[in-house]
């Protein structure tokens, strides 16, 4: 019995020793600690899209972003508007501003006001930050800068443009105005209407070499800046105004005004709409109205005259994005009704041949010197000196 007990104890001891040896020789598996789950990355709330408004053109420049509708008003990019005006933006103390003509206008994101000449003008809704730019109500901005607004209902397009009628023009300045028509050696119709390109070039050289300043009617508001202002006008909008006249204007860097008959654009021997736009965008050519169909204004009823004035005005606005301010009367004819209606649509009315023009005279009857095919450089110079 004792032997069996010893034997049993021996077995137990051997088994315990074996188990102890096995545990000592076997490495324990490391216990892995799970890494903490990172918190989810917050997803930025997307900026709500504002309803797109109508296309907007400012002084002939289309705003790339157009307009948006915010609180029932049309808003435009403050930065784009300034760029369209050719104004330089600056920022100080969080206020973004630009200077245009004699007015400094500014805005601050989130502020319920615009600033004009340092004075705050309250807005119905605050300045909106949208697409990383400041958006402001276009109507208020135009009113502060005295920029007119014209809405083209047919094409749902808004034009912001300055009319000469809003300017104060200094009085008593002598400004010779010259009337041309075609510029070509290929004469057709009435020969006297077509000046040879070589003769016109001599006339342009004379102007440049003798210190004359060819300007537009739009420049009369600052006429005192020019020593010898002169206005060159070309009636009817013939095709040669693009093929022969335009290259000469570019060569001598001279400004000119072309009076187009808008209903005849694209016709044989007349400018195309695309050519009109190209010349306007060059910065050398002002496009003004010669009515829509060249009918004698003094023979038309009042409503017919309105149609001639308004339709040609709209046609030019669509081509250039800038409101025309001058009407050239077909054949120089204008009735009392014409003169009464003119200020509703234009700031200047231009007749045919006459005497030198002085600022301050009746702007509805601007007189011009007639340059024909037979006008020599000497005769041209004499007209300048009268």
Annotate each language-model stretch with its function.
Residues 2-10:
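Bacterial N-terminal signal peptides that target proteins for export
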Residues 19-22:
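C-terminal motif of bacterial Sec signal peptides marking the signal peptidase cleavage site
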Residues 25-173, 178:
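Primary recognition of N-terminal secretory signal peptides and signal-anchoring hydrophobic helices
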Residues 165-233, 239-240, 299-386:
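C-terminal active-site subregion of NodB/CE4 polysaccharide deacetylases
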Residues 176-179, 213-217, 231-232, 250, ...:
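Short, well-structured secondary-structure segments
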Residues 208, 246-254, 271-289, 342-343, ...:
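Acidic (Asp/Glu)-rich catalytic clusters
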Residues 269-275, 304-308:
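Charged helix-capping and loop-helix junction motifs
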Residues 288-303:
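Substrate-binding clefts and substrate-entry loops adjacent to catalytic sites
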């Amino acid at each position: 019995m004792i032997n069996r007990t010893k034997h049993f104890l021996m077995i137990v001891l051997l088994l315990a020793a074996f188990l102890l040896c096995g545990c000592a020789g076997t490495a324990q598996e490391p216990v892995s600690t799970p890494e903490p789950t990172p918190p989810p990355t917050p997803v930025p709330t997307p900026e709500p899209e504002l309803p797109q408004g109508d296309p907007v053109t400012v002084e002939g420049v289309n705003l790339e972003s157009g307009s948006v509708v915010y609180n029932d008003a049309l808003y435009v990019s403050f930065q784009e508007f300034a760029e369209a005006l050719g104004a330089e933006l600056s920022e100080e103390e969080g206020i973004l501003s630009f200077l245009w003509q004699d007015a400094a206008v500014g805005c601050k994101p989130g502020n319920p006001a615009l600033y004009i000449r340092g004075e705050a003008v309250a807005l119905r809704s605050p300045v909106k930050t949208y697409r990383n730019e400041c958006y402001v109500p276009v109507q208020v901005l135009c009113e502060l800068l005295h920029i007119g607004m014209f809405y083209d209902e047919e094409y749902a397009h808004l034009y912001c443009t300055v009319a000469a009628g809003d300017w104060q023009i200094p009085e008593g300045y002598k400004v010779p105005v010259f009337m041309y028509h075609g510029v070509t050696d290929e004469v057709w119709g009435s020969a006297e209407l077509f000046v040879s390109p070589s003769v016109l070039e001599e006339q342009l050289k004379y102007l440049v070499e003798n210190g004359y300043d060819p300007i537009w009617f739009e420049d009369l508001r600052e006429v005192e800046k020019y020593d010898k202002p002169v206005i060159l006008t070309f009636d009817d909008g013939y095709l040669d105004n693009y093929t022969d006249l335009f290259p000469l204007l570019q060569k001598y860097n001279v400004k000119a005004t072309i009076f187009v008959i808008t209903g005849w654009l694209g016709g044989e021997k007349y400018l195309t709409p695309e050519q009109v736009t190209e010349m306007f965008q060059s910065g050398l050519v002002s496009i003004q109205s010669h009515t829509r169909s060249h009918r004698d204004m003094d023979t038309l009823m009042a409503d017919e005259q309105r149609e001639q004035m308004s339709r040609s005005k709209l046609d030019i606005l669509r081509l250039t994005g800038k409101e025309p301010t001058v009407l050239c009367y077909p054949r120089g004819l204008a009735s009392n009704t014409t003169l009464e209606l003119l200020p509703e649509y234009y700031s200047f009315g231009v007749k045919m041949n006459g005497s030198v023009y002085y600022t301050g005279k009746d702007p509805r009857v601007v007189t011009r010197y007639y340059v024909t095919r037979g006008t020599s450089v000497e005769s041209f110079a004499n007209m300048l000196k009268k």
